[in-house]
Amino acid sequence: MLTRKIKLWDINAHITCRLCSGYLIDATTVTECLHTFCRSCLVKYLEENNTCPTCRIVIHQSHPLQYIGHDRTMQDIVYKLVPGLQEAEMRKQREFYHKLGLEVPGDIKGETCSAKQHLDPHRNGETKADDSSNKEAAEEKQEEDGDYHRSDEQVSICLECNSSKLRGLKRKWIRCSAQATVLHLKKFIAKKLNLSSFNELDILCNEEILGKDHTLKFVVVTRWRFKKAPLLLHYRPKMDLL
């Protein structure tokens, strides 16, 4: 079978962020036009704009952040195509925590180890079969440990209801992984309140509706950075945005 080698330079336009011109980190896609950017770059841009940076289509007149989503597939592709990018990003995050004198979250440590395990077999000339068996063994080990993200960086949250149409939670104080998303919280609240669908809810921070794919870590960094724990979030029945 014939193979064709392609230089990384030839596909750079497809795996770089138009806003910062760097390789995509925490890739986030606009649902209207499917253009992808770094999450931090896109969120910062949408604080002052409501159009796509590439095609200028209006994402939403008033709540554009509701119509962007984390693109895990694209991020995986970027990490696989660009040698050392994932390790470099994890190193930057570790240095950031060390600089602040904070403990490095378990999820960052785990991703670093995972990246090394993914790269080392190929450097040593091992076969793909060996790589697959190692991956399966690692997944089985993880299931046996039953950690359930307890070693991740944790976020303390207070979930308050600000609508008379819904009742408050009996236990409004929760603690969960910083990698959990707003969607996870919606499902949790819907289950506790016996709602027919989690899509019937909006979750807000500082009176701003949060996108379903926002991680709690992202919310803390962008909406709660200089405030004390717990992170205060409000929920209400979903309102149709015009």
UniProtKB/Swiss-Prot annotation:
Cellular component GO terms, alphabetically? nucleoplasm; PcG protein complex; PRC1 complex; X chromosome
Q: Carries keyword Zinc-finger?
A: yes
Q: What is its main location?
A: nucleus
Alphabetized, the UniProt keywords read: Metal-binding, Nucleus, Repressor, Transcription, Transcription regulation, Zinc, Zinc-finger
Which intervals hold the zinc fingers (RING-type)? 17-56
As for what it does, the entry says:
Component of a Polycomb group (PcG) multiprotein PRC1-like complex, a complex class required to maintain the transcriptionally repressive state of many genes, including Hox genes, throughout development. PcG PRC1 complex acts via chromatin remodeling and modification of histones; it mediates monoubiquitination of histone H2A 'Lys-119', rendering chromatin heritably changed in its expressibility. Within the PRC1-like complex, regulates RNF2 ubiquitin ligase activity.
Subunit note:
Component of a PRC1-like complex that contains PCGF3, RNF2 and RYBP. Interacts with CBX6, CBX7 and CBX8. Interacts with BCORL1.
Per its record, how is this protein called by name? Polycomb group RING finger protein 3
